[in-house]
Structure formats: structure tokens, C-alpha cells
Amino acid sequence: MASVYENSYMIVLIFLLLGILLPVVALTLGRMLRPNKPSAAKATTYESGIEPFHDANIRFHARYYIFALLFVIFDVETLFLYPWAVAYDDLGLFALIEMLIFVVMLLVGLAYAWKKKVLQWL
């Protein structure tokens, strides 16, 4: 029985090593095999043939990041809700209650963000 567990961990270890090794090898080979001919034209930014007239480093207000995080949270919620909605007939009442608890937890978080006035635009 122990060999089954060891086998499972060995597969995970192999995938972990391959997941690290293959990108490192690909990036290293790409760096060694690519032509390296730096020039001033390659160092400039290019957008529609027009030279840039100001610095590309722009600071964004922190509220934009909060909106982005809230979007990601509710986007992931739809990823969890979709398989549940597809298999709704087979899952039964327990899955309905479980999903309702999940949605209520997210709505409580949204209500908390609303109460703290996080959702007000600048």
C-alpha cells in the first residue's frame, strides 16, 4: 500500500521538476541561440509610428487596484458557479445549500466593501 502513495508523490515530483526544468531550458536556449544585434532603433518605444511625447511610467490611484481585485473575486465566483449550474440536476439539495452559502459569503464581503465606501469612484 505504501508504494501506491510513493508512486503518487513520485508523479507529482516529476511534474514539478518538469514544470521548472522545461521553461528554464527553453529560455536558456532562446537566450543562447538568438541573434544579438543591439541598436538605437531597437531601444526606442514604438506606437503607430509616432514618437512618445511623455514618460510611460504613470501612477495609478490605489482604488483602481481595489476595483480590479473585486472584479477578479467575482470573476472567479462565476468560474465556480458555472460547473455547479451545469450539473445542478445531479447534485441535489446539499449542493444548492453549499452554493448558496458560497454566494452569501461573497455578498457579505461585497456589503462590507460597500459599507466601508470602497466602491465609491474617486
Curated annotation (Swiss-Prot):
GO cellular component term, pick one: plasma membrane
Top-level EC class as recorded in UniProt: translocase
Transmembrane stretches, start-end: 10-30, 66-86, 91-111
Keyword Transport applies: yes
Compartments it resides in: Cell membrane
Key words, A-Z: Cell membrane, Membrane, NAD, Quinone, Translocase, Transmembrane, Transmembrane helix, Transport
SS bonds (residue pairs): none
Catalytic activity: a quinone + NADH + 5 H(+)(in) = a quinol + NAD(+) + 4 H(+)(out)
Known partners and oligomeric status: NDH-1 is composed of 14 different subunits. Subunits NuoA, H, J, K, L, M, N constitute the membrane sector of the complex.
Gene that specifies this protein: nuoA
PANTHER family, per database record: NADH-UBIQUINONE OXIDOREDUCTASE CHAIN 3
InterPro entries: NAD(P)H_OxRDtase_bac/plastid, NADH_UbQ/plastoQ_OxRdtase_su3, NDAH_ubi_oxred_su3_sf
Keyword Transmembrane: yes
Reported function: NDH-1 shuttles electrons from NADH, via FMN and iron-sulfur (Fe-S) centers, to quinones in the respiratory chain. The immediate electron acceptor for the enzyme in this species is believed to be a menaquinone. Couples the redox reaction to proton translocation (for every two electrons transferred, four hydrogen ions are translocated across the cytoplasmic membrane), and thus conserves the redox energy in a proton gradient.
Its EC number(s): 7.1.1.-
UniProt-recorded Gene Ontology molecular function terms: NADH dehydrogenase (ubiquinone) activity; NADH:ubiquinone reductase (non-electrogenic) activity; quinone binding
Protein name per the record: NADH-quinone oxidoreductase subunit A
Membrane topology: Multi-pass membrane protein
Stated family: Belongs to the complex I subunit 3 family.
One Pfam entry name: Oxidored_q4
